[in-house]
Amino acid sequence: METFNFSVPQDITVGKGSLSKLPEIAKKLGGKHALIISGPHLEKMGLVKKAADYLASVDIKADTFTDIEANPSVTTVEKATAKYLESGADFIVAFGGGSPMDVAKAVGVVAKYGGSVTDYEGAHKVPGPIVPLIAIPTTAGTGSEVTAFSVITDHSRNYKLTVFSYEILPKYAILDAELITTAPASVAAACGIDAFIHAEEGYVSTAASPFSDALAEKAMALIGKNIRRFVANRNDIEAAEAMMTGSLFAGIAFSFARLGNVHAMSHPVSAFFDVPHGVANAVLLPVIAEYNALADHGKYLTIYNDISPIPAYADEFEPMMLVDAIRELCTDIGIPENLTIAINNASKTGTVTKEEIESRIEPMAVDAMKSGNIAVNPRASRQCDIEMLYRRAL
């Protein structure tokens, strides 16, 4: 066994109704004034006010910033940072899905150390602890509440930049399954399959370890056996709890094992065409699972049995059975059949032709190759391979 290292330096509270623990945790943090960074949907539903009221119950003031889009931009980080500094807040509550989490982490860096989030792009460029941060996810999910990454879109170059630093890990996380029951079916599907892919890519990564494998296996089992139920009925609290716990385990797993070609390739798709992150991942997954099948050394069977209603045994299993099972799962939960459909579903300017998409394949592949995840994909990949995979996904 190769040497591996792990550290999980967070305080994580998990349980139905655990949002009520926010005042206690905020007091433990020592905060007096919060900026709640969330999204417009949660604000409309009254959940942002509910969080603010919890803080007010222990005399903690709360301001809010909810002007956050999917695939949040450098400009959004600038606006949220200005709000934080103007408000006089001394800690941040990230309340929502991956977009508010990414923005909150970036604000925590820029508010403390100045400059632009682009100054911290890459690995280990954050000089020290950031503004204290409490993360409360409302999707299952990105796992962002337990990861050391913030992904922000830089529209000036159609690029999703990543800030990677253990300094941006939230100090506290609250996982309340009741909060994810309000998600529309499409959001539940996209976020749920994203969480599954976190576990799947971490599991087959060349950087996987016994520690990450144990978490990834449990995550895939929880998500794979419950995602259909949860998308069908978000009020199924048992399925919601399984999805949220699975997302948590997947987030920790890929923090150590990293990801692979799916995430490396999906970020450019979102940057160029504004496709939701989970949807971009999902339409790429079967294509890349087929590509990686040559490098499988037994793990595909485990993944298959986590998502297929009909179990298989080693003597009858073929890796292509997993590819078919992935396609079946994606169809069942309403994921678009291919990248062309996903891009057109996301388009705000009319039909995007296959020729237009083809013209972006080379620059997308160039950007995908910049991702560190390519290096740990189980099958080696050159730029020409990435271009080929994009074309197969169309």
Q: Where in the sequence are the language-model features?
A:
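N-terminal amphipathic/basic leader segments beginning at the initiator methionine
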Residues: 1-29
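Short glycine/serine/threonine-rich phosphate/pyrophosphate-binding segments
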Residues: 19-22, 44-47, 74-75, 99-105, ...
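Glycine-rich phosphate/diphosphate-binding loops that line cofactor/substrate pockets in enzymes
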Residues: 20-35, 54-58, 86
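N-terminal small/polar loop signature for handling phosphorylated ligands or for N-terminal nucleophile
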Residues: 43-115, 229-240
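A glycine/threonine-rich phosphate-anchoring loop and its flanking beta-alpha core
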Residues: 112-208, 299-302, 306
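Active-site segments that bind and position negatively charged phosphate/pyrophosphate groups
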Residues: 202-328
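C-terminal charged capping/lid subdomain of soluble metabolic enzymes
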Residues: 310-394
